[in-house]
């Protein structure tokens, strides 16, 4: 198992407070999202949590991802969604699954009274487009 905290300790103590630097963390081990990655991203300005990949980029996986990271890391410490697939024709479908997962999550937050529709619309744009642009430095 990867020990994210000890493994990145020296690096983050040197550059972790640099808000201009972006370090994106990806994992296939779902158990580390809530236990290590979300608290780390909530603390270190340079860190962003990468999107749920491989086995987790499914409707249920995306729901688990949001449940594990948002409470501690918030939305602004996420990297949105990017795609690494070699199956070029699946890219639109994968992004559609992400956007639908975002919409379901945000609708649930509205239903619980955590925020209103206008906040959800803003967060939907962030999660669908802006956070990925920011994480990868694609914003001029």
Task: Name these PLM-found stretches.
Residues 1-22, 32-47, 61-80, 98-107:
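Histidine/acidic residue-rich metal-binding segments in metalloenzymes
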Residues 24-28, 50-52, 75-95:
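Short acidic/histidine-rich active-site segments
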Residues 29-33, 55-56:
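Short, catalytically relevant binding-site loops at active-site mouths
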Residues 36-41, 81-94, 112-117:
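Short flexible/disordered coil segments
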Residues 48-59:
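His/Asp/Glu-enriched short active-site or ligand-binding loop at hydrolase and phosphoryl-transfer sites
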Residues 56, 83-87, 118-126:
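Small/polar glycine-rich anion-binding or flexible loop at a beta-alpha turn
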Residues 76, 93-140:
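Mid-to-C-terminal alpha-helical segments outside catalytic/metal-binding sites
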């Amino acid at each position: 198992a990867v020990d994210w905290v000890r493994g990145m300790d020296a690096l983050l103590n040197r550059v972790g407070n640099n808000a201009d630097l972006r370090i994106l963390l990806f994992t296939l081990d779902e158990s580390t999202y809530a236990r290590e990655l979300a608290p780390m991203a909530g603390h270190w300005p340079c860190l962003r949590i990468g999107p749920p990949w491989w086995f987790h980029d499914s409707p249920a996986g995306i729901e688990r991802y949001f449940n594990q990271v948002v409470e501690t890391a918030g939305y602004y410490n996420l990297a949105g969604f990017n795609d690494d697939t070699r199956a070029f024709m699946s890219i639109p479908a994968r992004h559609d699954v992400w956007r639908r997962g975002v919409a379901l999550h945000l609708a649930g937050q509205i239903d619980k009274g955590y925020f209103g529709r206008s906040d959800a619309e803003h967060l939907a744009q962030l999660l669908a487009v802006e956070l990925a642009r920011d994480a990868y430095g694609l914003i001029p």
